[in-house]
Amino acid sequence: MHTLSLPALGSSDAEANPALNVVIAYEDLETGKRAMKTYDYLVEHLGDQCLFANQMWKFDVLAVPKLKDIAAKDAATADIIIVSAHEGNELPEEVKGWVDLWLKYKTRASALVGLFGAESVDSPVRDYLASVAKRAKIEFFCQPGLWPGRTDKRDSLNQTLSVLASVMQEDHEVLHWGINE
């Protein structure tokens, strides 16, 4: 499914508040809801500074070549890319193909976010997404699982999202810097 939600823009709104584009790739309804909670958190914490847009792509539609290409172009122009999946051994091949495609398009993203349902310390999906972020030279944020020494998962997730919001705020403050202002 491909959705776009943009608030009504006046020219002064667009100049005062830059757009923050978020692409979400998700496995199913449950993981889509998890990703939307993260998106809503960002809107809640940065919504007064940015205009938000999102595109959502379900994993299974990424198997269709034309749709995969559109989704890859969306990801390449996004500021944040969120991948939300159930924990498993590997991401589906159609998702890896989509990732490879948006990497070829030279992403402008600032961050890649991984959201998973598992509670394990070891995660092949987490490792894969971390390597993708490294190749793309972007920040990687991951929902914490059972990390050694961590007991409260909710506080840890809120801390991770808070850091993500701070990084995005810093990246967009740089856009306002210059002699033309």
Q: Where are the predicted features?
A:
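Short N-terminal or domain-adjacent regulatory/targeting segments
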Residues: 1-19, 94-98, 154-155, 168-173
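Extreme N-terminal leader/targeting regions
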Residues: 1-60, 179-181
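Ser/Thr/Gly-rich flexible loops in soluble cytosolic domains mediating phosphotransfer, phosphorylation
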Residues: 3-4, 38, 97-135
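Conserved beta-strand segments of the P-loop GTPase G domain that flank and frequently precede/overlap
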Residues: 24-25, 57-58, 81-86, 112-117
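Short beta-alpha junction loops
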Residues: 29, 59-61, 109-125, 144-150
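Short acidic, S/G/P-rich loop/turn micro-motifs used as interaction or catalytic elements
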Residues: 29-31, 61-64, 83-92, 118-121
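Glycine-rich, aromatic-bearing surface loops/beta-hairpins
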Residues: 133-181
